[in-house]
Amino acid sequence: MRALGLVGLVGVANAVCPYMTGELGRRDTNPDATEATEEFLSEYYLDDTDSYLTTDVGGPIEDQQSLKAGARGSTLLEDFIFRQKIQRFDHERVPERAVHARGAGAHGVFTSYGDFSNITAASFLSAEGKETPVFVRFSTVAGSRGSSDLARDVHGFATRFYTDEGNFDIVGNNIPVFFIQDAIQFPDLIHAVKPKGDREIPQAATAHDAAWDFFSQQPSTLHTLLWAMAGHGIPRSFRHVDGFGVHTFRLVTEDGSTKLVKFHWKTLQGLASMVWEEAQQISGKNPDYMRQDLFESIEAGRYPEWELNVQIMDEEDQLRFGFDLFDPTKIVPEEYVPLTPLGKMTLNRNPRNYFAETEQVMFQPGHVVRGVDFTEDPLLQQGRLFSYLDTQLNRNGGPNFEQLPINQPRVAIHNNNRDGAGQMFIPLNPDAYSPNTLKGSTLKQANQTAGRGFFTAPDRTANGNLVRAKSSTFDDAWSQPRLFWNSLLPAEKQFVVNAIRFENANVKSDVVKNNVIVQLNRISNDLATRVAKAIGVDAPEPDNTYYHDNTTSNIGAFGHRLQSLAGLKIAVLASVDAEESFSAATALKAELSNDNLDVIVVAERFSNGVNQTYSASDAIQFDAVVVAPGAEKLFGAKSAANSSSTLYPAGRPLEILVDAFRFGKPVAALGSGSTAFDNAGINTAVEGVYVADAVDESFANNLEEGLTVFKFLDRFALDSDE
């Protein structure tokens, strides 16, 4: 891609603070953020250890039998214990989120890399090493709360900073763009992708007529759609996703100067994604897979980390790059504007109660702090800023949801907001209005020069005629999807083609299918032709209006080496009848002991040294598979159809090995276990297949190398013209 001259942007964020003015300096206290989280939330804990059961008002009770008129008589209306227990049960559930209902969360800490006061007045970025408590919620978008983690979908990545000047939320996704440009279209988008109104199916899926009808009629969706159809829609885990703020925001300094920025979270584990059949199988076997992975990783002390970066641009750059920076369907290629790292986030504490923390947390793009401001993005302005706040009234039955422990800031609250359902505070000021001259009742107004208040960028202006129209700078919906397509590896292109084929194979309307091909053809004739061939639509002639050969970096979900192997799982396929199986497993664990990997021994039944049985195992549970010596008898030619054992389904050991290879995972064998590869039809000369006589340093290193590659893309068939 043609690089643009950006002298003055690279390195604009530095550790020099030229703007230290204002009557109130930043709060200098910097307690350990992890301890601060525990100290704050512990005030709300209910600990039942060695306690008697009580009512909600504290009276000790027993609640295992209803009060009756005689042992066989009628239950009595006066039984307040029964009524309380049943009533509370009847009202446990609250309305789920309209979108992002399925999620998992964790606490952590953000550490600033330096003093960035030359680009923002935000206190949490004011000093090197400054720590800020955070809470992150990962999610899918379309599915209900009980849907699968493995649905192909955009994934939410919402982060709250509990800063010393109030809460700041980056309410983002794992994909840097969104489907629509104007928030007024949001109900249409969600109604289109949600289950059909007459039958409530399909759940957490877009493989249906309504979704693709909307996509083909609203070309702004195409860019995000391609990201979701690629590996980004089915990540390996929440730990292996990047995050993006999606919109362009403003950072504002103490003196009111501004920069435009895009927020990027970069996973320090490395990007990793699944392939579609693998994700489907996991969805059926363990729909909680990604929740479980995040929770267990943190419990084991394998704390996932992300780096917060920004792309920094001048106000004059709004239209500089050939698109509008306020269009949320566009990325700023890193060749145009490189990333500037601001700090690191570590998630190191699981919630103590899912409902109280992960379910009740409410994120809001309007949660901004001094030094952060909005832009004229029509998806952000009034759209998300209104909707995220408004929906909480429905979910919580009143306006006091900010008083829930997980939503409270870690600083004092002073305002004139009063009453409402569920009021938790006891305001001492009897005169809740401003301006106010009564003694003890005056709340001072905080602004740019007093009280370190929030302030809007002084140079922002609004003018123009009132029109219900889209800016012409938002019109091009095809050039950036083309850029995405051009930047993928051949195997990744095939994954996108396969995904769109799968989705549209479930579309019944020929009109919708033809419209889909029309839109795809505006991106790439190759893409459109390959999809059309599979879904019974005539291949189109090229529509080259938006065709170009530009590429950009850091687009695909594959082809990146993992930076950390912590928490990855290696299956050692063993047999309880072969002692050498367990000797090999023990040796492998010893060689890999410093890598924080899980080596899981799988055998026919539980015995000493066995972690899991074949009956409860599949290739989808593991990131690599090793066949141990002595286990080869389980992989015989007859084992695929019949089994002499009732302990596992016929062919299960062979199936695990074959599927691991098909899904692009590293596979290995030790000693006589290598004969299993013959029965599996695996060529030992291909990349990612390792054979050794015994465990040694070289074998362990090869296996680790295979895990960093994660997916060996040459195992996946490509269309012949690729």
UniProtKB/Swiss-Prot annotation:
Catalytic reaction(s) noted: 2 H2O2 = O2 + 2 H2O
Active site as annotated: 100, 173
Record-linked InterPro entries: Catalase (IPR018028), Catalase_AS (IPR024708), Catalase_clade2 (IPR024712), Catalase_clade2_helical (IPR043156), Catalase_core (IPR011614), Catalase_haem_BS (IPR002226), Catalase_immune_responsive (IPR010582), Catalase_large_C (IPR041399)
One GO term (biological process): response to oxidative stress
Names of required cofactors: heme
Keywords: Heme, Hydrogen peroxide, Iron, Metal-binding, Oxidoreductase, Peroxidase, Secreted, Signal
Keyword Lyase attached: no
Single GO molecular function: catalase activity
E.C. designation(s): 1.11.1.6
Protein's cellular compartments: Secreted
A single GO cellular-component term on record: extracellular region
Record's keyword annotation contains Metal-binding: yes
Pfam families: Catalase, Catalase-rel, Catalase_C
Residues the record lists as binding heme: 388
Chief location of this protein within or outside the cell: secreted
Signal sequence interval, chain numbering: 1-15
Family: Belongs to the catalase family.
Function according to Swiss-Prot or TrEMBL: Occurs in almost all aerobically respiring organisms and serves to protect cells from the toxic effects of hydrogen peroxide.
Name this polypeptide is given: Catalase B
Organism: Emericella nidulans (strain FGSC A4 / ATCC 38163 / CBS 112.46 / NRRL 194 / M139) (Aspergillus nidulans)
